[in-house]
Amino acid sequence: MGAALSCRDSLITIYFRHDKSNVKPPFSSIRIYHNKGELPFDLQFGEAELLVNRVEHNLEIGYTDVYFTDLIDTLDLQFSRNTKEVLGLEIYGFQFMNSDPGISYTSIGINGAGLYTYLANENFEEQLTAYPPDFFTFSVGTNDANVPFDRFDPQVYKRNLEKMMKIVLKANPKCAILLTVPNDSYYHRKYLNRNIARQREVIIELAEEYQQPVWDVYGLMGELGSSKLWFNNGLMQSDMVHFTSVGYHLKGDLLIDAFVKYLGQMKQIDELKKIK
């Protein structure tokens, strides 16, 4: 999910660089999500060409895996059309991987997206199955509820969220899911958004049904109208929907703190079960 690249040129080059970070995690393989079927382009890899070990194509789902003999942290990827017929190239995303232990983190989504956006994406379920998650956090709903009170149907939101949960669990039935309640916000900068509380109700209902945890950002902020207080303290932007950089960092820190505490609680519960 996110932005798709579409091009009909005969020669396309994409450069990968760590320009704005001192941390440059290396990778030993890359997965390129693209058009389904036979890919009408040959791949070249610039200075990394000699390091290519093998290339594998999945025509059914639409991706290509490229494996390198050594770790690299930059790449010049070139697509050259291998047919006279003018066929376009569509790129849906890239995955950079290595064999190091730890967590592989993937973020999906774009500004303005709601649950309906993901459900309308015909490639989402297939691509998720190709790389099934072990842990999936749902942090979506602000745009779903960013409508007048009488135009928001909590049951439609609940059904859409449950459909998404089922897609994730179909990809990996053992996947752990974290549901999050959207943050407090204002509608058109001046109207209190009373839909968030209604979202929270159905999110908690699903959490109880599927035995999954919930992180209540709405409650954490102070509930209805609290985004005004966060804005006054430099934590939200003037639209009182999006956070500032400082606000997003605080939100991330609070999520990690809650997550670590939750893991500790689960560990204690497991130990008590063993004693019994």
What does each model-found stretch correspond to?
Residues 176-178, 244:
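Extracellular low-complexity Ser/Thr/Asn/Gly-rich intrinsically disordered segments
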Residues 1-45, 54-159, 242:
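Conserved SGNH/GDSL esterase-like catalytic core that processes O-acyl groups on lipids
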Residues 48-49:
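Intrinsically disordered, low-complexity regulatory regions of nuclear DNA-binding proteins
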Residues 183-276:
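Catalytic His-Asp segment of secreted/periplasmic serine-dependent ester chemistry enzymes
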Residues 121, 125, 158-165, 200, ...:
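Extracytoplasmic/secreted envelope proteins and their assembly/folding machinery
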Residues 133-145, 154-161, 169-170, 178-217:
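Conserved N-terminal glycine/acidic-rich loop preference
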Residues 168-173, 262-265:
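Secondary-structure transition/capping motifs at alpha-helix termini
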